[in-house]
């Protein structure tokens, strides 16, 4: 019998990354993912449901949506089942988070950056997604220079993560991906001595404790 929950399942993913009580998990994961580029000390969780701008517009429901202490917007999604246009879906979600920043009346169009992080428990057929990690940003075609930091999408294809043992994991980001892929198979939570956040994860993800709640 499994000891821990499976982070790739919707409710478990939200329990780990989308709760005020467990936001340390989200913060350490994001800091590991973006390293020194995005240093997060705290996050405020926002409403995950965004209605359309007009009555006939389609709304969206994010898995996790938060705003960092520096005002950056972060969306985190887990997609377990293969979806043909998931790359486009992530773009749509990012665009919605940008558009929702618009206000009526006098506005200078200053936008807060939006980061969308997509866990994918499948290998996409999209030609732009060939590696475990793909980062999409706005760049100039000629110079290849980044022209705006207002939008970034990170796709993480879990089946392409090539570190299969604890010893191969070199930093906290590697550890997080290894755990997300394999947590439901663990008897003990790895990396707990090196990174205290994983002791917290072991507590909130223990199925025995959940059954008593």
Stretches found by the model and what they are:
Residues 1-213:
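Elongated, amphipathic alpha-helical interaction scaffolds
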